[in-house]
């Protein structure tokens, strides 16, 4: 997709159902080289855009709800971006050859909200484009651990447009039992709860699929936050889906 089309979509309000960063700060340009800007467009021109992250030169992980429900839709991934509204020399725009939502994905409760994207061509590794490591199968995060999530989301609750520049916020891993009280369908087996109960800091609109980074590894990807309660968000637990990710990458 030509860069100008991406610029035009960012002039539009965020689509309901996407998620964005609330709070946080603008990161040093290209200091998060794994970040991907994911766009899904159907035949009528309806767009969904999300975050995602490069895990191999030709594979990106994002949220399953970032896929347009229309059968006739296309997806593109932009890598190496900092200011998504600018035509940066570092950017690599690559069409998606195949999207693979998890077969157990439930759009109502965001269960198994994870999707693997196979790119049409391999990304060229540069200082602005590099994969993010996945954790080992026995790796865990615990309550109190501090992680981060980045994206091009809004800077405030009332802002309906995406941020031009990549922003990041630090989040604290929360107790599972506390999150079960606030999120009816929260499942600790497949999800991680992170945020800050005392501050308004969380992903919320326009940044679904962005990685929860702990110790330079992707432990989660952003799935959803509770309307009216944005002190924390729910992330799909990457460790739980490692066998599924590995299997599909070998098949393609």
Curated annotation (Swiss-Prot):
Prodomain residues: 19-20
Annotated localization: Cytolytic granule
Protease in keyword set: yes
Keyword field: Cytolysis, Disulfide bond, Glycoprotein, Hydrolase, Lysosome, Protease, Serine protease, Signal, Zymogen
Domain Peptidase S1: 21-250
Disulfide bonds: 50-66, 147-214, 179-193
Glycan-bearing residues: 68, 83, 106, 158, 227
Signal sequence extent: 1-18
Entry superkingdom: Eukaryota
PANTHER family: GRANZYME D-RELATED, KALLIKREIN-RELATED
Protein name: Granzyme D
């Amino acid at each position: 997709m030509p860069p100008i089309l991406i610029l035009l979509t960012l002039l539009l309000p965020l689509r309901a159902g996407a998620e964005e960063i609330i709070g946080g700060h603008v990161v040093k340009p290209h200091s998060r080289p794994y970040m991907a800007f994911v766009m899904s467009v159907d035949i009528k021109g309806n767009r969904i855009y999300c975050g995602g992250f490069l895990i191999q030169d030709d594979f990106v992980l994002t949220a399953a709800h970032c896929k347009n429900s229309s059968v006739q839709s296309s997806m593109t991934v932009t890598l190496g971006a900092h200011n998504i509204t600018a035509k940066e020399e570092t950017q690599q725009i690559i069409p998606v050859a195949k999207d693979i939502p998890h077969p157990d994905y439930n759009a109502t409760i965001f269960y198994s909200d994870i999707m693997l994207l196979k790119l049409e061509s391999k990304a060229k590794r540069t200082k602005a484009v590099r994969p993010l490591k996945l954790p080992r199968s026995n790796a865990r995060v615990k309550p109190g651990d501090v992680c981060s999530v980045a994206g091009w989301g809004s800077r405030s609750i009332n802002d309906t447009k995406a941020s031009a520049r990549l922003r990041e916020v630090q989040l604290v891993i929360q107790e599972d039992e506390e999150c079960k009280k606030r999120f009816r369908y929260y499942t600790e087996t497949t999800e991680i709860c992170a945020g800050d109960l005392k501050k308004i800091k969380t992903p919320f609109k326009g940044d679904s699929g962005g990685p929860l980074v702990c110790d330079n590894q992707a432990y989660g990807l952003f799935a959803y936050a509770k309307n009216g309660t944005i002190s924390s968000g729910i992330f799909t637990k990457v460790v739980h889906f490692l066998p599924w990710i590995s299997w599909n990458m070998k098949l393609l």
